[in-house]
Amino acid sequence: MTVTNDPVVLMKQEVGKAAAQRVHSDTIIGLGTGSTTAYAIQYIGERIQTGELKNVVGVPTSFGAEVLARKYGVPLTTLDVIDKMDLAIDGADEVDPQKNLIKGGGAAHTREKIVDSLADVFIVVVDSGKLVDKLGSTFLLPVEVIPMAVTPVIKALEKLGGKTDLRMGVKKAGPVVTDQGNLVIDVKFDNIEDPANLEKTINNIPGVLENGLFVGVADLILVGEIIDGKPRVREIS
C-alpha cells in the first residue's frame, strides 16, 4: 500500500483491505470500479503475488478495473467463460438503510450491475459520507443512453419529474462516453420514494440501456469511518 498520512486515503485503504480479506483461494471475483475498490484490487493482487491466494480470477466491471487488475497481477476472465461469481466487490455513490444503492459516478454502472448481480455475495465498499436516508439525496442518478435516443430519453425522464443533465467529460472535450460507446444522462429526483419501481420505469424507456439504481443486490456494506483520527471499518448486513 502507498504510505500516506491522509485520514481519508487511510480509510479507503482499510475498507479496501477489509473487502480483499474476504477473498479466498479457488474463487471467481467481480472487480468493481472506483477509488475505494481500487485499493481492494491492489490488495488482492498483493495477496496473489505472495502466494497467500491461489487460483483466483477476476471479472472487471470497466476498462479501468481491467487496467488495475493487470497492473497488480490479478488474472482475468470474462462472462463468455463463466456464468457466475463467488464474490463481487464494488463501490457506491449512495447507500440507503435497505442497502439499496446509486452507482455510476464512474459511468460503469451497466457493467457493474451485470457483474454484481451474478455474484453469490456482493460486498459494497464506501465511506460513511455515502450513507443516506433516501437515495437521490446527495447524488444524481446516472442513466446510460444510446446516442441517438438522448433527446427523447431526456424528455421522458423529465416527465417522471427528473431534472436532467448530459454528463460532460473532464479534461476532454464533449460528453462522457461509456465503455459501451453510449452517453450518460445524470438525473436529479427530489425524492426517490420507491427505488425498485423507478429502476424498472426508467429501464423501460426506449433508448435506455441501464440506470444506476441497484435495488436488492447488495449483501454486505463495509463502511469506512474516521474515529478519533483513525480509520475504522463498520459492517452493515
UniProtKB/Swiss-Prot annotation:
Coiled-coil portions: none
A single BP term in Gene Ontology: pentose-phosphate shunt, non-oxidative branch
Gene3D superfamilies for this protein: 3.30.70.260, 3.40.50.1360
EC top class, as a word: isomerase
GO molecular function annotations of the record: ribose-5-phosphate isomerase activity
Keywords, sorted A to Z: Isomerase
EC number: 5.3.1.6
Catalyzed reaction equations: aldehydo-D-ribose 5-phosphate = D-ribulose 5-phosphate
GO cellular component: cytosol
List of residues binding substrate: T33, G34, S35, T36, D90, G91, A92, D93, K103, G104, G105, G106, K130
The family this protein is said to belong to: Belongs to the ribose 5-phosphate isomerase family.
Task of the protein: Catalyzes the reversible conversion of ribose-5-phosphate to ribulose 5-phosphate.
Subunit and partners: Homodimer.
HAMAP family xref list: Rib_5P_isom_A
NCBIfam families noted in UniProt: PRK00702.1, rpiA
Name recorded for this polypeptide: Ribose-5-phosphate isomerase A
Upper taxonomic lineage: Bacteria, Bacillati, Cyanobacteriota, Cyanophyceae, Oscillatoriophycideae
Gene: rpiA
